[in-house]
Design a protein with these regions (language model features):
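Bacterial N-terminal signal peptides that target proteins for export
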Residues: 2-17
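Bacterial N-terminal signal peptides
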Residues: 15-26
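Structural boundary/hinge residues at secondary-structure and domain interfaces
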Residues: 30-183, 228-289, 306-422, 439, ...
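Hydrophobic, ordered structural segments
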Residues: 55, 186, 191-196, 200-219, ...
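Long compositionally biased, domain-poor regions of proteins
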Residues: 107-110, 168, 289-294, 392-421, ...
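A conserved glycine-rich beta-strand in the N-terminal activation segment of trypsin-fold
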Residues: 181-264, 505-599, 608
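Ordered core of a single globular domain
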Residues: 425-430, 439, 523
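Extended terminal
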Residues: 527-528, 557-674
């Protein structure tokens, strides 16, 4: 039996909710409501809150970012970008009968959104807006929502005992694109009070949120230990007067619910990465949350984040067995003295150093590797083939390489001029406790690889990957629920291990098609291009070192205030040098062709997923002004992380630009592509 399009079970639940609404609706005369974290349930998987929308806007406008947006030379681009953002936003908000413009007119206080999994595998979206002082605008918005829903052929549902504040619409069923899939049931509900508006795609959740606006609920998000730990740690770092953005997510919980609520339009073969992470112990990460503020304490932007991942019961919080299975690789011991090495060039765009227990990571990766490939024993097979295959390097990877590495991993980033699709450069430097052994292992491995050629860079022996293809490299990126094909299985094929290694190598070549490798300065150096490796090896240190740069020193001093003791990560970046490659590619309309790691990731996320295709650029950058005219708006950034009993605490800041002159990006001495 159905009642106006709603089944009896759902109607009974709604009636129960509405009964509580009738009792609790009298609160509305009193005005504002408790913080949204006391309104939304403990089953909230993701949450975003802006307690002071006006204050946030004012603070943003005072930052260099706000000044950039207001720069007259940026007007054409900003207007076009806002139009596009509005269109993209409408595709999502339209499901609730809203637009981005709507959200800018009605808030008088907090605006919060939540993704709620009240029923396993069903993700609901609820938006809560404090409309204090904007009651007329809120009423007009509700009328517009109703008009838009009716234009989409929605039907208003009438349920007995429902208070007049809540309205429910049933939308026509929507096919998800699969011929064998049933049409999706869609509803929109909204409730309006004198000082609040609640909108969502689940009438029960909207009704419950509205019903508890007076006092909050006992089973609220604040009863989630991960939420209270993360927001408790980070919230005390930035006062409410700074108009912060607050956020929280249960990463695996959200991913699983999103996956179940949004099945792929096409059936995909291969591993389910969300399920794999859960199986491999990464569900030890219970939640991630933090706060972000603009124009606070002399910083253009300030952020604090806690990854809540306490040790499993009975485990040592800082030991290698803190977690199970592959999650044991998440071991980042704190240390003192993290700073740029003398050989890090002064003009770099960015530097990041991470303390990582690589030995534990290596011994933990086996089960994850096998799970992703889809065949138990594959990792051991690959390791054995490296040692025993007569055509291979015949090395013991654990003994000859991993055991000779330290715990410091450093990333250097920069770019070369003129800016093109292959301008960005990176160097990954891994500390070597026994450089001679690492160098010998690298030489033996490279000599057995026909795709690597030996080169000489000054007094250093290095190896460079021979680029045999001009094809645009791509990274396969999967959204939650997505998958890539498993490695082919060749039952009875003696060459199966070789085939697996070859496939892995092909992926490496796509990622870094011009890579060069050497051992120098007590590190294994892996460079994206030969020219950046040459620059690092030739750097004399001293005044030419990043550590000697004035902007690094001032930014490092700010980071030291955030992390005065030991840390597992320290990072420095120059916003202008970091942003410039992407900025110029946007101006050229060439971002989809970018060969940088970031560009490939972006293209993988935004592309159609079909191999060999180049996505259409989503943002029109043709109206952007010359970069030099806006460089002054970009300053420096810093980031730190420390390992705690609760997980990992991170904090960082963006500093306004000083009077420093930009470090000049060095043009490659070799032809493009090196």
């Amino acid at each position: 039996m159905r009642c106006n399009g709603m089944n009896v079970g759902a109607r009974q639940v709604l009636q129960a909710v509405f009964a509580s609404l009738v009792v609790g609706s009298s609160w509305c005369l009193a005005g504002s409501f408790p913080p949204s974290e006391k309104i939304f349930p403990a089953t909230t998987r993701a949450w975003l809150s802006v307690p002071d929308t006006r204050g946030l806007q004012e603070r943003f406008d005072r930052t260099p970012y706000g000044q950039l947006v207001a720069d007259p030379t940026m007007k054409a681009f900003v207007d076009g970008f806002r139009d596009q953002l509005s269109k993209n936003g409408k595709q999502r908000l339209a499901k609730l009968g809203l637009t981005l413009e709507d959200l800018g007119k009605v808030p008088g206080g907090e605006v919060a959104a939540a993704a709620i999994e009240a029923t396993p595998g069903v993700l609901s979206t609820v938006l809560l807006v404090d409309t204090t002082g904007h009651e007329a605008e809120a009423k007009a918005l509700v009328d517009r929502i109703a008009e838009r829903l009716l234009e989409r052929k929605a039907t208003k549902i009438t349920v007995p005992n429902a208070p007049p504040q809540l309205t429910v619409y049933q939308l026509p069923p929507e096919q998800d694109g699969r011929a064998d899939a049933p049409a999706r049931d869609r509803r929109v509900a909204f409730a309006l009070a004198p000082a609040a508006l609640v909108v969502g795609d689940d009438a029960v959740q909207v009704g419950q949120a509205f019903a508890v606006l007076a006092q909050g609920r006992q089973d609220s998000l604040t009863t989630n230990p991960s939420f209270t730990t993360a927001l408790g740690r980070c919230g005390k770092e930035i006062p409410a007067t700074a108009a912060p953005i607050r956020w929280f997510i249960d990463p695996l919980g959200f991913a699983k619910a999103y996956q179940a609520s949004n099945p792929p339009r096409e059936k995909r073969k291969g591993p389910d990465y969300v399920a794999i992470l859960g199986r491999q112990g990464f569900d030890a990460v219970k939640g991630i949350g933090g706060v972000v503020a603009f124009d606070h304490a002399g910083h253009s932007l300030r952020h604090h984040t806690l990854v809540h991942a306490p040790a499993l019961p009975g485990r040592e919080p800082f030991g290698p067995e803190r977690f199970d299975l592959a999650a044991r690789m998440l071991r980042f011991p704190d240390t003192e003295g993290i700073a740029p090495p003398a050989w890090a060039p002064r003009e770099l765009a960015g530097w990041t150093a991470l303390q990582w227990d690589l030995q534990t990571a290596f011994t933990s990766i086996e089960t994850l590797f096998d799970d992703v490939v889809g065949e138990k024993g594959t990792f051991d097979d690959v390791i054995a083939s490296l040692k025993e295959d007569p055509d291979g390097p015949q090395i013991d990877l654990q003994k000859d390489m991993v055991a000779a590495l330290g715990k410091r991993v450093t990333l250097l980033s920069h770019h070369v001029e003129p800016i093109g699709t292959d301008s960005e450069r990176i160097v990954i430097a891994i500390e070597a406790t026994d450089p001679q052994r690492v160098a010998a292992t690298v030489a033996k491995t490279m000599a057995a690889d026909s795709d690597m050629q030996k080169i000489q860079i000054g007094t250093h022996e290095a190896w460079e990957l021979i680029d045999r293809s001009m094809a645009i490299p791509q990274i396969e990126v999967e959204t939650p629920g997505g998958a890539v094909a498993h490695a082919d299985r060749h039952e009875g094929d003696d060459d199966s291990a070789h085939r697996r290694r070859q496939r892995l190598r092909e992926k490496e070549e796509k990622l870094l098609p011009h890579s060069a490798v050497t051992v120098a300065h007590g590190h294994l150096l892996i460079a994206s291009h030969r020219d950046i490796l040459e620059r690092v090896l030739a750097n004399p240190g001293g005044a030419d070192s990043l550590a000697a740069a004035a902007d690094y020193k001032s930014t490092a001093a700010e980071l030291a205030r955030l992390f005065p003791g030991k840390a597992a990560v320290r990072s420095f970046g120059r916003e202008d040098e970091t942003i410039k490659p992407t900025y110029e590619l946007l101006r050229q309309g060439s971002m989809p062709k970018s060969k940088s790691v970031f560009g490939q990731l972006l293209n993988g996320i935004l592309g159609d997923g079909k191999p060999g295709t180049v996505r259409e650029q989503k943002i029109d950058g043709s109206t952007l002004p010359e970069f030099e005219s806006v460089r002054r708006y970009f300053g420096t950034t810093c980031l730190g992380m420390e390992t705690t009993e609760e997980g990992w605490y991170m904090a960082g800041a963006a500093l306004p630009r000083s009077d420093r002159k930009p470090e000049v990006a060095r043009s490659p001495e070799a032809p493009a592509g090196r």
